[in-house]
From Swiss-Prot:
The chain crosses the membrane at residues 97-119, 366-388, 418-440. It is an enzyme of class 3 (hydrolase). NCBIfam families: PRK10779.1, RIP metalloprotease RseP. This is Putative zinc metalloprotease PM1991. Its cofactor is Zn(2+). It comes from the Bacteria.
Amino acid sequence: MSFLWSFASFIIVISVLVAVHEYGHFWAARKCGIQVHRFSIGFGKVLWSRTDKQGTEFVISAIPLGGYVKMLDGRNEVVPPELSSRAFDQKSVLQRAFVIAAGPIANFLFAILAYFTIYTVGIPTVKPVIADISSNSIAAQAQIEPNTQIMAVDGTKVSDWETINMLLATKMGNDEIHLTLSPFGSSIEQHKVLNTKDWRFDPEKESAMSSLGLQPVRTKVDMILSKVEVNSPADKAGLKAGDRIYAGEQLISWQQFVQFVQEGKPFNVKVERDGQFSFVVLTPELNKKGRWYVGIAPTAAPISDIYRTELKYGILEALQKGVEKTIQLSWLTIKVIGKLFTGDLALKNLGGPISIAKGAGISSEIGLIYYLGFMALISVNLGIMNLFPLPVLDGGHLVFLAAEAVRGKPLSERIQNLSYRIGAAILMALMGFALFNDFLRL
């Protein structure tokens, strides 16, 4: 995946979602009779502009990392008496709150529309069937059996591994997780309880489900090497593409092999090449990301059709599913943010623009429907983040308006300005920390 592809995919995501967000503010302002001076996508030098009959200038600027809607406002300019009724600051608290909240609401509506489209067209996925259970894991202690399908997590129905993984991640810090299971192909329900009191995991190194010992049905892996990286530990040991790897007399599984590598210690493997057998010692090394690796890729076969499914519904059900998915993602986002503040999830998991760019590039390469799903996810995150009660964000403005409604008058300009400075400092610190984490992951 090229840098340019990821960058272009990222710019499209940000530009579309910013346009959606700002259009929410713009539409609400027009509905409330507020004069809008400018609707801008991006910052900096103006690349294109057009002014409509109502005097609003629509602008595309050079730096596509944000946007804004500039409204007539007596706090920032001298308003002619004949236009005072069209100034933002002269509108009622309820009208101003509507204009401010309309941005995040537009992001949520976009997510609903995106998921409605996805579920109408149909999106291929893999049924959440457990292929194997890692030994000595939390799932093993709960006596969960392979070849069972996860039907619900703490009562929330699930139909794919992506949703399960996100749900499990939000359970960090909980003492227990309740799973509803069914033997694959059966309607008989089983209920298992995962003891997660001491459960912790690093999302950079493993998924929530794998850290619990749940191994999903994956592409079938044959331990015939399809690739050996140049100058990798495997290359130094003499391994070549086409070699078949064994552990003693038993054919090693990819999961077992990964466990050996992650221990970071030298281990012996038996190698078959052109009908001849030999033994080599593989010594894992740390890569740039601080992970143990040996530099090989196995041969992969497609997942059996019996485990494949397509999430596709009629128009009304697709709309319902779109609403449910958006609500679910919103709640999951809030819970994850909460766990970042409580320490249940480390702040190093906070991602910034580089992480978004990577996700945009990967999803766009997989297919348009997955790219749309990624945009919906980021749109939900954008909506939630903008509702944070920081003065520089929409949520902070809503807090000021709530205070005005209670007091009968706005907070003093001094308090508001001080709050803006503090909010801006906090936001810049979070953005800087997220960007720092992004660079560490490169």
